[in-house]
């Protein structure tokens, strides 16, 4: 069967280059100096018996981060980024993730703790590995690259050939060709991507085989790495021989289980190899790859795509390696692994020949030009070995003064980077912050998570057989359909709350600008709020705390409100302080004082300059990707300045508070101050009652309260309801400008999955 010919004749280039990729990355938790920790796996990650993303490999210190499979390599690496950020922000503040594959600072063997798992068989398996290989070899880490061809491609290729009658037989032989050819040419990606040139002497039982100042390309892939005894050979000639020889080694006791066979390619998709005979190989796991210490997550997008294309080349090639060729590949791997990283490889001609075939394949299947160019960069590294990853790593080790020193320095930099935007998941930065926070907590606690629609903030979460849908961080099936519709309409909200006996301010509604402006005499001199009938996040709201005295200002506020809706309300302004109550179920979980957008004068700078300086705060940004919003100087802000006799060019006196907004929404530049513990419980109970009247499970209730310490009384002079909000913002509670953080996303997960708590 000539796959090249079929792909070309049937125009299958796009389908051919597609596939599904998942990555497993092992790493050691270390101290700041790069030495391995002896602490337990953090309990904050939940139970390893079910965690889909954050596991331990051999030891308690050895993290294993597992991405879900994705059709886009970019998405797989985004997940890997998110898993690293969750992990680095969760482990002890004095712990780091070591960026290299070979361990450094190994503690005495008796202090290396085998992973403490619930399943006794899993622990027993690890104890067997200790007896067979010692603990040091088990501490080696790397990247496992899981790859599946597009099932439609496999089906199309099967239908286009005549050699195989059974689809299962065809699929097995297709994946076996991929596996055998990879094992034949595995030395090539090792030459280009290896990064384990050295290790400390205590890694070896009988002394280091390395001479002083000697570096090699890959200790991990050499006979000193994570490998079986040299006489354990499993045949890849056919799926039947593979099953037969693998079962032989297990039955003879040389391997305790099939998974102890440490081939650089592992057949995947069944619990036992014999099942492949009937169900077929589903995907392959490529276990060759060292961690790239120069990348925060151990691998970069270019290399991940290169690996993808190299794997595809293995079935594109006309040849199919037999077992002798597989063994030749294993021998060459051992030779190249022990070459000097700065030296030209003994097999340069073969390497250049294969990469040239890769370039031809990329052009034939219509790959991106960038993929061709990157393959050409790899080709050039055969003539310039100093450009390879391992050679560059050796240079960096020499410059840093040692392997462990370099690893510790990089580990510390990576952790600092993970905290630069500690409130976000940088790979999913286009999603709203509340959703990112929920995703962070879901990953940390071990919920399966699927992003159904990234732009619409739609997630599917699952624990066991129980699944829930979440939109925008806290919109769930626990809310009734009607509740957000009630809260969106401020007129309906007021009527529902009034009927339920809650204090609401009086108001009039208008359907045209002319009608509203004509009513100015009714409100002249009165303190009023002008706002759209249907609004959220403070859009279109103007507040005249000192009374409205200028018809032009009144008209401008009306015009601003009508930009947001076709109906507008003018309501009495309630005297007091506005607080936001976050209610979930039967409990008020957080209370926030939102201080309207403001600046403090210094007697030197203009209002515009003071605003610019305050906007430089690292938590301020667009308000959707940052916890705080930058303060604007638009029409509403300039109206507010005019009320105070100021303009943007005014220079306020020292310590003069300048209000830029009357409404206190964080989404319009306000400051957030946690007041949960200071608020009298009677108001918290009122907020719960208001939420129930709305028919909501999650609600943001805005109350005006003159004195938060006095118990609530049944009149407007004691308290009043301004708004009830669906999908209330959570980030201002999680990351307040001042006060205690309230991690509300954990409460949302607790509501959805009480069995997880």
From Swiss-Prot:
Provenance organism: Mannheimia succiniciproducens (strain KCTC 0769BP / MBEL55E)
General function of this protein: Synthesizes glutathione from L-glutamate and L-cysteine via gamma-L-glutamyl-L-cysteine.
Residue segments, region Glutamate--cysteine ligase: 1-337
InterPro entries: ATP-grasp, ATP_grasp_subdomain_1, Gln_synth/guanido_kin_cat_dom, Glu_cys_ligase, Glut_biosynth, Glut_cys_ligase, GshAB_ATP-grasp
Functional pathway: Sulfur metabolism; glutathione biosynthesis; glutathione from L-cysteine and L-glutamate: step 1/2; Sulfur metabolism; glutathione biosynthesis; glutathione from L-cysteine and L-glutamate: step 2/2
Binding locations of Mg(2+) 1: 702, 723
Subunit note: Monomer.
GO CC field: cytosol
Catalytic activity: L-cysteine + L-glutamate + ATP = gamma-L-glutamyl-L-cysteine + ADP + phosphate + H(+); gamma-L-glutamyl-L-cysteine + glycine + ATP = glutathione + ADP + phosphate + H(+)
Domain (ATP-grasp): residue spans on this chain: 494-757
GO terms assigned for molecular function: ATP binding; glutamate-cysteine ligase activity; glutathione synthase activity; metal ion binding
Binding site for Mn(2+) 1: 702, 723
Keywords, sorted A to Z: ATP-binding, Glutathione biosynthesis, Ligase, Magnesium, Manganese, Metal-binding, Multifunctional enzyme, Nucleotide-binding
Gene behind the chain: gshAB
Family: In the N-terminal section; belongs to the glutamate--cysteine ligase type 1 family. Type 2 subfamily.
Listed EC numbers: 6.3.2.2, 6.3.2.3
Enzyme class, first EC level, given as a word: ligase
SUPFAM superfamilies: Glutamine synthetase/guanido kinase, Glutathione synthetase ATP-binding domain-like
Protein name: Glutathione biosynthesis bifunctional protein GshAB
Note on how the cofactor is bound: Binds 2 magnesium or manganese ions per subunit.
Residues that bind Mn(2+) 2: 723, 725
Superkingdom of origin: Bacteria
Chain positions recorded as Mg(2+) 2 binding sites: 723, 725
Residues where ATP binds: 521-580
One protein family per Pfam: ATP-grasp_6
CC cofactor: Mg(2+); Mn(2+)
């Amino acid at each position: 069967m000539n796959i090249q010919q079929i792909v070309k004749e049937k125009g299958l280039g796009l389908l051919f280059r597609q596939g599904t990729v998942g990555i497993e990355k092992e790493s050691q938790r270390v101290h700041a100096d790069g030495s391995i920790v002896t602490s337990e796996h953090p309990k904050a990650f939940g139970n390893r018996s079910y965690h889909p993303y954050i596991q331990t490999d051999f030891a308690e210190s050895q993290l294993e981060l597992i991405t879900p499979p994705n059709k886009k390599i970019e998405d797989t690496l985004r997940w890997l980024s998110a898993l690293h950020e969750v992990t680095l922000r969760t482990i002890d503040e004095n712990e780091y993730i070591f960026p290299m594959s070979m361990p450094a600072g190994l503690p005495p063997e008796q202090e290396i703790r085998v992973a403490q798992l619930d399943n006794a068989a899993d622990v027993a398996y690890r104890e067997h590995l200790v007896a067979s290989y010692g603990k040091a070899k088990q501490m080696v880490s790397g990247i496992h690259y899981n790859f599946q061809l597009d099932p439609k491609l496999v089906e199309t290729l099967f239908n286009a050939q005549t050699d195989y009658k059974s689809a299962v037989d065809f699929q097995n032989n297709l994946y076996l060709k991929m596996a055998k050819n990879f094992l034949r040419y595995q030395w090539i990606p090792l030459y280009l991507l290896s990064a384990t040139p050295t290790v400390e002497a205590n890694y070896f039982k009988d002394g280091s085989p390395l001479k002083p100042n000697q570096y090699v390309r890959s200790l991990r892939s050499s006979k000193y790495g994570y490998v079986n005894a040299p006489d354990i050979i499993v045949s890849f000639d056919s799926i039947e021989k593979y099953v037969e020889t693998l079962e032989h080694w297990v039955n003879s006791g040389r391997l305790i289980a099939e998974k102890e066979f440490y081939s650089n390619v592992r057949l995947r998709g069944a619990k036992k190899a014999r099942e492949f005979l009937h169900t077929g190989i589903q995907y392959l796991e490529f276990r060759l790859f060292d961690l790239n210490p120069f990348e925060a997550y151990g691998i970069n997008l270019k290399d991940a795509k290169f690996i993808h294309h190299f794997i595809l080349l293995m079935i594109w090639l006309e040849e199919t390696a037999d077992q002798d060729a597989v063994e030749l590949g294993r021998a060459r791997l051992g030779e190249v692994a022990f070459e000097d990283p700065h030296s030209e490889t003994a097999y340069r001609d073969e390497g250049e020949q294969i990469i040239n075939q890769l370039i031809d394949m990329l052009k034939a299947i219509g790959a991106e030009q960038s993929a061709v160019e990157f393959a050409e960069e790899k080709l050039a590294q055969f003539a310039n070995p100093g450009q390879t990853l391992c050679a560059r790593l050796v240079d960096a080790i020499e410059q840093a003064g040692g392997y462990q020193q370099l690893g510790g320095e990089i580990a510390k930099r990576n952790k600092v980077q993970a905290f630069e935007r500690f409130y976000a998941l940088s790979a999913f930065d286009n999603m709203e912050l509340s959703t990112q926070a929920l995703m962070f907590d879901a990953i940390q606690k071990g919920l399966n998570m699927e992003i159904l629609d990234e732009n619409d903030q739609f997630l599917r979460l699952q624990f066991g057989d129980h699944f829930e849908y979440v939109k925008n961080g806290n919109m769930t099936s626990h809310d009734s359909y009607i509740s957000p519709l009630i809260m969106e309409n401020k007129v309906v909200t007021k009527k529902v709350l009034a009927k339920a006996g809650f204090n609401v301010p009086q108001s009039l509604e208008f359907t045209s600008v002319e009608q509203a402006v004509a009513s100015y005499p009714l409100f002249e001199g009165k303190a009023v709020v002008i706002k759209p009938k249907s609004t959220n996040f403070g859009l279109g709201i103007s507040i005249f705390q000192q009374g409205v005295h200028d018809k032009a200002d009144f008209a401008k506020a009306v015009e601003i409100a009508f930009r947001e809706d076709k109906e507008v309300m003018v309501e009495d302004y309630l005297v007091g302080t506005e607080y936001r109550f976050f209610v979930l179920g039967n409990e008020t979980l957080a209370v926030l004082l939102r201080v309207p957008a403001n600046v403090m004068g210094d007697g030197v700078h203009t209002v515009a300059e003071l605003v610019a300086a305050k906007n430089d705060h690292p938590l301020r940004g667009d308000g959707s990707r940052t916890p705080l919003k930058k303060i604007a100087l638009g029409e509403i802000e300039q109206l507010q300045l005019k009320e105070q006799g100021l303009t943007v060019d005014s220079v306020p006196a020292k310590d003069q508070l300048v209000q830029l907004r009357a409404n206190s929404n964080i989404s319009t530049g306000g400051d957030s101050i946690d007041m949960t513990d200071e608020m009298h419980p009677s108001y918290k109970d009122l907020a719960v009652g208001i939420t129930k009247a709305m028919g909501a499970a999650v609600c943001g209730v805005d109350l005006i309260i003159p004195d938060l310490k006095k118990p609530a009384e049944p009149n407007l002079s004691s308290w009043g309801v301004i708004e009830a909000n669906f999908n209330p913002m959570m980030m201002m509670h999680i990351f307040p400008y001042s006060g205690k953080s309230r991690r509300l996303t954990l409460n949302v997960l607790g509501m959805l999955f009480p069995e997880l708590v």
